A protein has these predicted regions:
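Walker A/P-loop NTP-binding active-site region of P-loop NTPases
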Residues: 143, 147-202
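Residue-level signature of catalytic and energy-coupling elements of molecular machines
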Residues: 14, 19, 72, 94, ...
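Acidic-enriched and Gly/Ser
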Residues: 2-10, 17-135
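P-loop NTPase nucleotide-binding/switch module
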Residues: 73-75, 82, 89, 102-150, ...
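Conserved catalytic network of the ASCE P-loop NTPase/AAA+ motor domain
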Residues: 145-147, 173-180, 204-209, 239-244, ...
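Nucleotide-state-sensitive switch-loop elements of NTP-binding domains
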Residues: 180-182, 191-239, 267-285
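Phosphate-binding/switch loop-helix module in NTP-utilizing enzymes
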Residues: 224-262
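Conserved catalytic/coupling modules of large nucleotide/cofactor-utilizing molecular machines
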Residues: 235, 257, 267-468
Length: 468
């Protein structure tokens, strides 16, 4: 009798349905946010409590087909949040936001399930960053290095090469370097299914899929699915870090879509937006995912995030909410892309807190600082050249202007993942070699070469081959 009374206390009923959101009334016991609500007559139909509505009523995001739900249907609070399968059995698999396999390889046979909502590490548990992770991409390694255990953001508008460079980073770090004791996790949040399929084929072909997990919530999915895809992927990263004691390489495309999905959810649940049009909980939602991507005693979590910039406006509030968590910010430029300087990265707009003598070394730090100074001078000289021509510059300025163009062209690089489109074989350049070549360019060793000879070469050793 007591059990039946307890069940009645946590029962409720559906009073309205709008798309993927159901309004549920619990007249007595109040459920907790993120509790899973199921139909009494069909426990396989699940909802997640998202927000409070009015007295004793709550908005629930439907996680199953809405065709199963009707007004007046009785529901029961399961008393726990969404869980996903974990363990070594998920390696090599492609799953959705709820841990269901979507790769036609059958069910994931594991007895271990973990909730997707967890608290981040405490301050005393976080391991400081002290090592640079080489990417083999000159412009990133020199100006915006990826810290092992840190976060790097690829920031840009549509069609400027963010996903291409993200895929190249996966290729260089996961496939070429084959980091020891490392697991790779790719979170596809609100992006194209085609890109995830191409990545899956590449990982399978190169034989690294068994050390990788892909978590996908494509752009065609409901915002509730896209929103939870990020949590699922991060939960797996934490599991491999803390339980399996592995280093984790975490890639997400696209973090802006996570913020966008949260905004769409707040709209359908009648939440009044903030002044900039986004959900008022944007900052806290971003914190719940970013602060969990930390390195602990179990292992390091190194993160690369593609970040879409709507209307090429870097000051967009969703974009700004991500910036505060990044160690290195790589900014893409449409103007540079149209000039065919690839990767189309704006060196002077990009920056990194990891670019310090303690982390990268004195030689690297000095080379990067001097290179940025030279490029800044070249911007001023460019204005003069556009008005009166290069011949009107002083001899000293003419040398600096040419040297800056040599340096800018040297930062272009053929990428492995677009070899079939560019018809140029990809090149991996060690970070120390990039620093050495930059020092030589700044010293004027190559002033007798033309800037065009530095386009899409790997190192300065390739100059002779290009001339012949």
């Amino acid at each position: 009798m007591k059990n039946s009374e307890a069940t009645l206390r946590i029962q409720g009923k559906i009073i309205s349905i709008r798309g993927q959101v159901a309004e549920v009334e619990f007249p007595e016991a109040k459920p907790r946010l993120r509790d899973v609500i199921v139909l009494v007559d069909d426990p396989s139909t699940q909802m997640e409590l998202y927000a409070a509505s009015i007295r004793n009523t709550y908005y629930c995001v439907v996680l199953s087909p809405t065709s199963r739900i009707t007004r007046g249907a009785r529901v029961i609070n399961r008393g726990s949040s969404v869980t996903i399968p974990a363990g070594k059995e998920v390696l090599g698999r492609v799953i959705d936001a709820f841990g269901n396999p979507i790769d036609s390889k059958g069910i994931i046979e594991t007895t271990e399930h973990i909730p997707i909502y967890r608290s981040p590490l405490g301050y005393h548990e976080i391991i400081p960053k002290s090592e640079i992770l080489d990417t083999g991409i000159k412009i990133i390694d020199l100006f915006c290095p990826l810290v092992k255990g840190g976060k790097l953001g690829l920031v840009g508008g549509a069609g400027v090469g963010k996903t291409t460079l993200l895929t190249e980073l996966i290729h260089n770090i996961v496939i070429l370097r084959e980091e020891e004791n490392a697991i790779s996790i790719f979170a596809g949040v609100g992006e194209r299914t085609r890109e995830a399929h191409e990545l899956l084929e590449t990982l399978t072909l190169k034989g690294v899929l068994p050390r990788t997990v892909l978590v996908l919530g494509a752009m065609g999915e409901h915002p509730a699915i896209r929103f939870r895809t990020a949590y699922t992927a991060i939960t797996l990263a934490e599991y491999f870090r803390d339980t399996m004691k592995k280093n984790v390489l975490f890639f997400v495309d696209n973090m802006y879509r996570f913020a966008q999905a949260g905004n769409e959810l707040s709209t359908v649940t009648d939440v009044i937006p903030s002044e900039d049009g986004y959900q008022p909980t944007l900052t806290s939602e971003m914190a719940t995912v970013q602060e969990r991507l930390m390195s602990g005693r179990g292992g390091m979590v190194s993160t690369v995030e593609a970040i879409y910039v709507p209307n090429d406006d870097v000051l967009d509030q969703a974009v700004q909410s991500i910036f505060v968590y990044l160690d290195s910010i790589v900014v893409f430029s449409r103007d540079i892309y149209q000039k065919n300087f690839l990767p189309a990265i704006d060196i002077l707009e990009s920056h990194s807190s990891a670019l310090t003598p303690d982390l990268v070394g004195e030689k690297h730090y000095t080379a990067a600082f001097q290179a940025q100074s030279l490029l800044k001078k070249a911007v001023k000289l460019e204005r003069i050249v556009s008005l009166i021509g290069e011949s009107e510059l002083t001899p000293e300025d003419r040398i600096l202007y040419k040297r800056a163009n040599i340096l800018r062209n040297f930062m272009t690089q053929p990428l492995y993942v677009v070899e079939d489109q560019s018809h140029r074989p990809g090149i991996y350049v060690p970070r120390q070699k990039t620093v050495e070549d930059t020092v030589r360019i700044l010293a004027g060793e190559f002033d007798n070469y033309t800037p065009d000879e530095f386009l899409y070469i790997g190192t300065t050793e390739n100059l002779h081959a290009k001339r012949t």
